[in-house]
């Protein structure tokens, strides 16, 4: 446990940079506050003794008033110290959590796609939001309290033993017996809190998956099975939360009982000592205050440790994410593309998503500048994988991919990405204006170019029917068809105006009329660009200069449409299966 805590501390240090001074001031304010809390009962003892001795003669009102005024002043100072401590701790912890979120956002951009292949979106989102929030809230509620209470316990112990060791021993022994009992619970709670965070991530991930696929779930009448699976995950979450929260909730009642038990013992033993003339009434009154002061911070420490363990579990998941293997550092790579012609060569490329399963086998092909290259094949043939490798979303295992004779291994990923415009089957639009979506991350794009690209893909008329035209904000109130979303993403790719173009099943999700509209626009705008097209509808790639037919990660046929049809092989069978004999002859 100590090694783990030390590891978490070391991992946290970079995110605490610049906050040390604020934490130091908060620590000093905590010390001042605790000194005042401990010192107060000693003056109350003096006041009690003055009042007790004055019962036989006369009460020294001036002395009592002086002590009362002094106590009022120092308690105001104690209040201000507590306020300062809370303010500084809260500020530092929230700044710490802000930096963690920033680090996670940056980390996501540095993670390879392999990571997301093996982790659900819900689990990743849970680490970004739930785990960071849990850590911040738990630290905010407990860090200052545990520190303050620990210092207070030490100060009270020193003061009590200095005043009367017998009553001090009674207080300490009775309290520590109960505290030892509590520590048994503490040892088991860490695992429960970790399970709670993991089960919460599982529920979030499942809900996100079912929400995004709601139409599919409904169409397959899988609602009942979905509810059953959710019930299992939800019950598991209930079980882990119940265990962690039960242990958390039982701490305070136990510590209150311990405090009351110690309080009663001090009164009984103190009364016996007073009757024997060993202590004054003032000492008993002071110890009655110290018992409360001593047991209360122990209760707070117990609660605080529970919260810190919850924070530790959450931070462990956050730092586990931040420690994931990143993409290769490419700062040393300086090869760039200039005056691009657009020739792309795959030279004996092999790749597998896992070391034990190769997807692409010794893949070789050449796309000459300006050619339209189509990649076809059945599902699982490796078509999309080829595009992922071309874009350097994954690093190839063997062979090379060269753009204008420059090996992409020698280029930064950003340099490769700049060379391509890309349209995916799954459209991505963010909440913002249509104009912002079209010129996404591109500079110096004029309104004229935006309109020209929109007209080229046939979406301009629809945009102008919207109340705010290109300034219409895309959110839940704006309903777009699949085809309209696809046209917007194609217009975005056209505006990028990159020399290389990738269309990954860009027309597979639209109706025939929209497909024809897109195809005409793309045929016209692909002129002069090297284009890679992946499509299940083979009618869209009959005019391709080169068709690569893939099966099980291998190129089994290649040529143009007429050549492949003459071969009467796999491509011809695939083509004829999609069209009637009359259409095929055409």
Where are these regions (language model features)?
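An intracellular "coupling" helix at the cytosolic face of ABC transporter transmembrane type-1 domains
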Residues: 17-18, 113-114, 132-139, 143, ...
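ABC-type nucleotide-binding domain
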Residues: 330-331, 337-586
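Membrane-integrated ABC transporters
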Residues: 1-37, 52-67, 85-89, 93, ...
């Amino acid at each position: 446990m100590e090694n783990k805590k030390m590891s978490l501390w070391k991992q946290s240090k970079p995110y605490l940079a610049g906050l040390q001074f604020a934490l130091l001031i908060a620590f000093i304010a905590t010390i001042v506050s605790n000194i005042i809390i401990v010192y107060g009962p000693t003056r109350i003892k003096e006041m009690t003794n003055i009042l007790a001795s004055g019962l036989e003669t006369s009460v020294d009102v001036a002395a009592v008033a002086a002590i009362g005024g002094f106590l009022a002043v120092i308690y105001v100072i104690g209040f201000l110290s507590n306020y300062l401590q809370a303010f500084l701790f809260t500020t530092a912890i929230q700044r710490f959590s802000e930096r963690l979120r920033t680090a996670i956002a940056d980390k996501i951009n540095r993670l390879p796609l392999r990571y997301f292949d093996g982790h659900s979106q819900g689990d990743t989102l849970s680490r970004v939001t739930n785990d960071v929030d849990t850590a911040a809230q738990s630290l905010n509620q407990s860090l200052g309290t545990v520190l303050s209470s620990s210092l207070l316990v030490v100060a009270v112990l020193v003061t009590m033993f200095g005043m009367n060791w017998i009553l001090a021993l009674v207080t300490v022994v009775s309290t520590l017996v109960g505290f030892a009992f509590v520590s048994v619970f503490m040892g088991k709670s860490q695992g429960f809190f970790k399970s709670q965070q993991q089960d919460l991530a599982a529920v979030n991930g499942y809900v996100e998956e079912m929400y995004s696929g709601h139409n599919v779930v409904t169409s397959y009448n899988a609602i009942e099975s979905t509810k059953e699976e959710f019930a299992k995950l939800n019950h598991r979450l209930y079980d882990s939360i119940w265990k962690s929260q039960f242990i958390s909730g039982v701490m305070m009642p136990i510590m209150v009982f311990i405090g009351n038990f110690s309080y009663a013992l001090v009164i009984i033993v103190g009364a016996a000592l007073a009757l024997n003339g060993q202590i004054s009434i003032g000492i008993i009154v002071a110890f009655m205050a110290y018992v409360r002061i001593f047991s209360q911070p122990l209760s707070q420490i117990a609660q605080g440790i529970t919260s810190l363990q919850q924070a530790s579990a959450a931070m462990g998941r956050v730092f586990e994410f931040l420690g994931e293997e990143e993409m290769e550092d490419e700062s040393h790579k300086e090869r760039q593309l200039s005056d691009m012609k657009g020739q792309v060569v795959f030279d004996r490329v092999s790749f597998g998503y896992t070391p034990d399963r190769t997807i692409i086998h010794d893949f070789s092909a050449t796309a000459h500048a300006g050619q339209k290259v189509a990649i076809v094949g059945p599902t699982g043939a490796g078509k999309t994988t080829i595009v992922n490798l071309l874009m350097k979303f994954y690093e190839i295992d063997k062979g090379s991919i060269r753009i204008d004779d420059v090996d992409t291994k020698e280029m930064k990923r950003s340099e490769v990405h700049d060379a391509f415009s890309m349209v995916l089957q799954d459209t991505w639009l963010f909440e913002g204006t249509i104009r912002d979506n079209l010129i996404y991350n591109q500079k110096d794009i004029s309104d004229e170019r935006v309109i020209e690209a929109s007209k080229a893909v046939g979406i301009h008329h629809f945009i102008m029917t919207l109340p705010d035209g290109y300034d219409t904000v895309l959110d839940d109130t704006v309903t777009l068809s699949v085809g309209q979303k696809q046209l917007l993403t194609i217009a975005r790719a056209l505006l990028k105006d990159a020399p290389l173009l990738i269309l990954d099943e860009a027309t597979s999700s639209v109706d025939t009329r929209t497909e024809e509209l897109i195809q005409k626009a793309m045929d016209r705008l692909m002129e002069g660009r090297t284009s890679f097209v992946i499509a299940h509808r083979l009618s869209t790639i009959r005019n391709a200069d080169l068709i690569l037919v893939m099966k099980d990660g291998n190129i089994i046929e290649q040529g143009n449409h007429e050549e492949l049809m003459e071969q009467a092989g796999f491509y011809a069978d695939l083509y004829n299966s999609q069209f009637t004999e009359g259409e095929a002859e055409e």
